[in-house]
Amino acid sequence: MTIPAFHPGELNVYSAPGDVADVSRALRLTGRRVMLVPTMGALHEGHLALVRAAKRVPGSVVVVSIFVNPMQFGAGEDLDAYPRTPDDDLAQLRAEGVEIAFTPTTAAMYPDGLRTTVQPGPLAAELEGGPRPTHFAGVLTVVLKLLQIVRPDRVFFGEKDYQQLVLIRQLVADFNLDVAVVGVPTVREADGLAMSSRNRYLDPAQRAAAVALSAALTAAAHAATAGAQAALDAARAVLDAAPGVAVDYLELRDIGLGPMPLNGSGRLLVAARLGTTRLLDNIAIEIGTFAGTDRPDGYRAILESHWRN
C-alpha cells in the first residue's frame, strides 16, 4: 500500500477519506499523537483556539477537518448560504502551523447517501433540537465518521455549542470510542459577545444589541447565590431590555443538561434571534452554593468565568 505524501512542518491538504486515514495511521505508528479539530470552515479566533489547544499536546499532529455537513441542516435552513471561505481558512491554518487539513466533498463523506445514521438520545430533541429535530442526528453522524476516518487520540470542540459537546461525549461513551473529547472555553470579543461565524450577518445595530446575551449571563452569575429563579430573573431582565433581541430559550440545567438541582454546578444557556441571525451563548454557573455563607476566594473566578467559558 502506498501512503499519500506527507511533508512535516507544512500544511498537507487531503480531500479523500482514505488518504487522511492512511496518513493518520502512518503517523501514529511513528509515535505522533493525532489531534482532530472538526469545523465547517469560515474559521475565526474561536476555531483557532481549538487548534492552539490541540497543538499544545506534546508530540501532536493536528488534523483540521473542513466540511459543511448537509445532514445537519434542516428544512428552511439554507445550506447554500452557509459562509465558505476555503482559501482564507487554509491560509489561517498555515499561519497556525497546522500540518493536516481534511477537506472532503459531500460525495466522499456520504458515497451511498444517508444509508446508516446515528440516532441520538432524548437530549437531542431539547433546546437546540426543539426547532431543529434532525440537527443533532446529522452532527453525531458526521462526527462518528470523522472519528473513524482520522482515529485521533483527542478531538476538540468549543464550549459555545455546549449541547453539541454534551451529545458528542454521550456518543463517545455509548459507542465505546477510544478517543478523549476535549471542551475548549468559548472565545469572546472584547465586549463579551461569543465569537461565531454567524456574527458577520449582524448589522451595526444588531451587533450592539447582541452583547445583551453575555451581559444577561453575567447578571445571572452575580444573582445565582440567591437561587436558580433569581439567576433566571436577572438574565431575563437584561434580555427584555435589549432592543431587537427575541429570546428562543433561556434555560438553567445541570452540567450534563439534565434538570438543575436546587444548589450546585449548572449551565445557563440562551438562544436568541436578532433579525434573521440566531445566536447562542452559555456559561458555567454555581447556584446557591455560597448563599448565607462567607464567599470563598474562588468566588470571583466563578463570576468571571463566562469570559473563558
From Swiss-Prot:
Effect listed in the UniProt record for changing Q164A:
50-fold reduction in activity and slight reduction in the affinity for beta-alanine. 30- and 40-fold decrease in adenylate formation and pantothenate formation, respectively
Q: What is the effect of changing K160C?
A: More than 1000-fold reduction in activity and 120-fold decrease in adenylate formation
Just give the chief location class.
cytoplasm
- Residues recorded as bearing N-acetylthreonine in the entry: T2
The record's Pfam families line, in alphabetical order, gives: Pantoate_ligase
Q: Does the keyword Metal-binding apply?
A: yes
Active-site residues, as the UniProt record annotates them: H47 (proton donor)
Q: How is it used?
A: Subcutaneous immunization with the double panD and panC bacterial disruption mutant protects mice for over a year against subsequent virulent M.tuberculosis (strain Erdman) infections; mice show mild lung inflammation and fibrosis despite a chronic bacterila infection. This is a promising attenuated vaccine strain.
| Chain residues that bind beta-alanine | Q72
Please list the residues that bind ATP.
40-47, 158-161, 187, 195-198
Q: What happens when the gene is disrupted?
A: Simultaneous disruption of panD and panC gives a mutant unable to grow in the absence of panothenate. The double mutant has a highly attenuated disease response in BALB/c and SCID mice; immunocompromised BALB/c SCID mice survive on average 36 weeks as opposed to 5 weeks for mice infected with wild-type bacteria, while immunocompetent BALB/c mice survive indefinitely. In wild-type mice bacteria grow for 3 weeks then undergo a steady decline, bacteria persist over 8 months in SCID mice.
GO MF term set: ATP binding; magnesium ion binding; manganese ion binding; pantoate-beta-alanine ligase activity
GO cellular component terms attached to this protein's record: cytosol
What's the catalysed reaction? (R)-pantoate + beta-alanine + ATP = (R)-pantothenate + AMP + diphosphate + H(+)
Q: Biological process (GO) annotations?
A: beta-alanine metabolic process; pantothenate biosynthetic process
Task: State its location(s).
Answer: Cytoplasm
Binding-site positions, Mg(2+): D88, D89, Q92
Q: What else is known?
A: The reaction proceeds by a bi uni uni bi ping pong mechanism. Was identified as a high-confidence drug target.
Function, as annotated, reads: Catalyzes the condensation of pantoate with beta-alanine in an ATP-dependent reaction via a pantoyl-adenylate intermediate.
Which protein family is named in the record?
Answer: Belongs to the pantothenate synthetase family.
Name under which the protein is recorded? Pantothenate synthetase
From the UniProt record, report the name of the gene that encodes this protein.
panC
